[in-house]
């Protein structure tokens, strides 16, 4: 961490502790806003600049129709979910218990409907090892054979078949390397999807993601969205 970032971190920590930064904070994208409680410097930073996620949220807002069902897979503390709830009914998936608690608190403040679900979506149901970030808002939790935590996984298709969640129209996936397993577990659900955006992490070939989305009859593109990471976007073309 650079000296500048250390100073900024200390400044925000002091502001949080002294009440100079008040909770809730407001985050806004394209005129759509939501309020978020903040309990750490990391959450202040995440809400203040959305960690470079503005373009992702903007796309979700542009593509979602009123009252669509949006799956936010890898929701973290709920920035995307809460802002997008102004247009869509959001089902927010977050397996980390600490982060899930923060997601739930923010969902209660959301301007629209956000249903928090403490599941890790995958290709099948079961238990897997999971390595949480030491700080809830960091968003660097990941599946790992050496993980210190066990989480429950379930496939998206199984959730739909059980009636617990409706089929999605819009999907956002940000799962730190588990992207392919998430998509393999929702091959049926993808048939109803009009728009999906998948953030690509280390170890995942974006071409493998485009292949799965193409099988669901979605047209695909790989883009950067002004970020270092690749994103795969899938859209259903109107006949």
Curated annotation (Swiss-Prot):
Pfam families the UniProt entry points to: Methyltransf_21
EC numbers, comma separated: 2.1.1.-
InterPro entries the record matches: FkbM_mtfrase (IPR006342), SAM-dependent_MTase (IPR052514), SAM-dependent_MTases_sf (IPR029063)
Keywords: Cytoplasm, Methyltransferase, Transferase
UniProt GO cellular component terms: cytoplasm
Pathway terms, separated by semicolons: Cell surface structure biogenesis; S-layer biogenesis
Disruption phenotype: Mutants exhibit defective or limited motility.
Superkingdom as given in the UniProt entry: Archaea
Signal peptide: none
GO molecular function: methyltransferase activity
Top class in the EC scheme: transferase
UniProt record similarity statement: Belongs to the FkbM methyltransferase family.
PANTHER family the UniProt entry points to: METHYLTRANSFERASE, FKBM FAMILY PROTEIN, SLL1173 PROTEIN
UniProt function note: Involved in the assembly of a N-linked pentasaccharide that decorates the S-layer glycoprotein and flagellins. S-adenosyl-L-methionine-dependent methyltransferase that modifies the hexuronic acid found at position 4 of the pentasaccharide.
Protein's name in the database: Hexuronic acid methyltransferase AglP
Species whose genome carries this gene: Haloferax volcanii (strain ATCC 29605 / DSM 3757 / JCM 8879 / NBRC 14742 / NCIMB 2012 / VKM B-1768 / DS2)
């Amino acid at each position: 961490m650079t000296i500048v970032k250390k100073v900024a971190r200390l400044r925000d920590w002091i502001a949080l502790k002294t009440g100079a930064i008040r909770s809730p904070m407001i985050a806004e994208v394209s005129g759509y806003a939501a309020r978020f409680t903040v309990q750490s410097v990391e959450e202040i930073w995440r809400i203040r600049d959305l960690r470079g996620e503005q373009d992702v949220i903007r796309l979700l807002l542009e593509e979602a129709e009123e009252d669509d069902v949006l799956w936010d897979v890898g929701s973290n503390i709920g920035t995307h979910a809460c802002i997008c709830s102004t247009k869509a009914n959001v089902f927010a998936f977050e397996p980390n218990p600490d982060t899930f608690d923060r997601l739930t608190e923010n969902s209660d403040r959301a301007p629209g409907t956000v249903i928090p679900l403490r599941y890790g979506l995958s290709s099948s149901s079961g238990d897997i090892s999971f390595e949480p970030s030491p700080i809830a808002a960091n968003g660097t939790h990941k599946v790992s054979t050496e993980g210190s935590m066990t989480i429950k996984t379930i496939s998206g298709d199984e959730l739909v078949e059980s009636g617990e969640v409706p089929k999605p129209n819009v999907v956002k996936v940000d799962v730190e390397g588990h992207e392919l397993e998430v998509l393999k577990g929702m091959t049926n659900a993808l048939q109803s999807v009009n728009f999906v955006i998948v953030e690509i992490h280390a170890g995942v070939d974006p071409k493998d993601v485009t292949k799965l989305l193409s099988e669901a009859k979605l047209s695909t593109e790989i883009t950067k969205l002004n970020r270092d990471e690749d994103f795969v976007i899938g859209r259903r073309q109107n006949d």
